[in-house]
Amino acid sequence: GVKYEDAKKILENVGLSVDGIKLLKTIHFLTESELAFPNIENITKGYICDLTTYYDFKSDIQKALDVLVEQKQLLLTNSNYKITTDEESKLLEEMNDFDVELFIKKRDMVNYLKKTGIFNQISTINDDAQPYKFNILTDQEDEISSSSNKQLGFTVYSLFNINGSREDFIEDLKLQTQYNKDNITLVPNIDSFQEIDRLISDIKKYSHMEEKYSTESDNTIKAVIREFSTIKEEAEKSLVSKLSDAYLNGSLIYMYDEILLNGDSFKGSVNETQRKLIKNIYTKRLNSSLSDSLAPKILIENNNDKLSRYFSSNDFAFFDKNGNFVGDSLKVVEEIGSKLTRLIDGKSLEQDLSMAPWGYTFGTIITTLASLFRAGRLIVKYNNQEYFSYSDKSVQEVFTNTTKFKLASFKSLNKSLSS
């Protein structure tokens, strides 16, 4: 028939030695006999005369099948091949006339990239027992895993935006970003780009056909659209897998360094680079942090000589053994103190000091303020009233309730000797 002749011509045109007529007859026989599935293994066995030549022929037959699927002579579902019917050919032709625009492909790629889940493992990293959430965006600022902390930047390049040679692209990128301390860039491997591009287009085309014929009453057409849905699902699985591979085997660029990634080293290599970034931008970070549960304890402790026992780290040696405040030269007191020259609300204080270069935790900020308040070094303004005494019960809730802390304001009270 015409289909058999077409298959023969198509394979001859691409220079394959597989006989198109014989190949389609083999598939037809397997489909009709129902003795074995028409998959690559059985088609190869049916095509050859001598079983010892199986491996000589298999890769060429696979290439021939791929070409015929691409040319819509065959349909591939669940690893089985079948010759397209006239109805299928007609619908496939109609489907092929549907054009998928580049901006749609770019958008769909981002959605499927999120579905790979590979960025979940690197979106938040713990360093010195403190979590840092990275702001992961594409190079066109599509969100993959966003964070309110824009200083922890992570750019993922779209496969569609790597122009020319990948090596040249990476060299240019290294030069452009060599002084950017606050951003890491991931460039995918582009070996499978053509296939990924084709899968994204095909999936969109199958979806278009599903929508167009969703209310179809003709059973023959309905059956073909059901087949299309199955093919689409398989294409989606294949796409997610290929996208994962492209990014897991990409290159990481940070301050002129290029780190080659693979599936096994991906998380470790990315985390190591993230720690470098954290170290580079949080230059005033402390070696340890405090828990916010300490703040109220400092205010209600009756024995001054017990105050120093609440703090084990030298970063927070606010009190001596007698309960005298001796923390003026501590880094944390100097840094927080520099923000307290005028009244500042708790919310702004936390927002500022949690960012680079400090990276202080909420617990560190609130407990340091509680210590300053205990030492008579702080004015707390709350509910339009100024408080100077730490023992005042009505102000203590500022240090036990996050919302109330954010609404309260704080200012240094400088202790100076009066004559």
Question: What do these predicted regions represent?
Answer:
Residues 1-419:
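Extended alpha-helical interface modules used as scaffolds for assembling large macromolecular complexes
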